[in-house]
Design a protein with these regions (language model features):
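A short helix-loop-beta-strand connector motif used in the catalytic cores of GNAT acetyltransferases and
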Residues: 2-13
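Conserved beta-strand in the GNAT
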Residues: 14, 20-29
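Conserved acetyl-CoA pyrophosphate-binding loop and the N-cap/start of the following alpha-helix
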Residues: 15, 53-64
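Conserved active-site alpha-helix within GNAT-family acetyltransferase domains
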Residues: 21, 71, 83-104
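A conserved beta-turn-beta hairpin within the catalytic core of GNAT-like acetyltransferases
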Residues: 31-42, 102-103
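A short, internal acetyl-CoA/4′-phosphopantetheine-binding micro-motif in the GNAT/acyltransferase core
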Residues: 43-55
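Conserved acyl-CoA
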Residues: 60-76, 101
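Conserved beta-strand-loop-alpha-helix junction that forms the acyl-donor binding cleft
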Residues: 65, 77-91, 110-111
Length: 113
């Protein structure tokens, strides 16, 4: 976390309500594999359950990240997704409300224990 807070190609922002941290977003910009253009990649986005105005706080966090990617870093696209599968319907609705479009799919392969 400390690395991402200090590296110029990483973004880290906390949401505070009262005297408590209630949410965060972090991500980075990276060049595409076959192009020098930049892609914004969200790595974590969370607002604590039970937080008043949770969706609004989450949207503000994500808009801050998107603005940083597109305006400050001049990325051509921002990629984000629900890879945890927590409240997926609500998360999908919030993404769409913020202007994201759904594409592709995410798969995982886990080590057997």
């Amino acid at each position: 976390m400390l690395y991402s807070m200090q590296h110029p190609d990483y973004y880290f922002m906390l949401a505070v309500e009262g005297n408590e941290y209630v949410g965060a977003v972090c991500g980075q910009v990276v060049p595409f594999y076959f192009s020098p253009e930049l892609l914004g990649l969200e790595q974590a986005w969370y607002v604590r359950e039970g937080t008043k105005n949770r969706a609004s706080i989450g949207a503000k966090l994500m808009h801050g990240f998107v603005d940083w990617c597109l305006e400050t870093k001049k990325a051509v696209m921002v990629q984000s997704g629900d890879v945890a599968g927590i409240r997926s319907v609500g998360v999908d609705a919030l993404y769409r409300h913020m202007g994201f479009t759904r594409y592709g799919a995410v798969y995982r392969y886990m080590r057997e224990t």
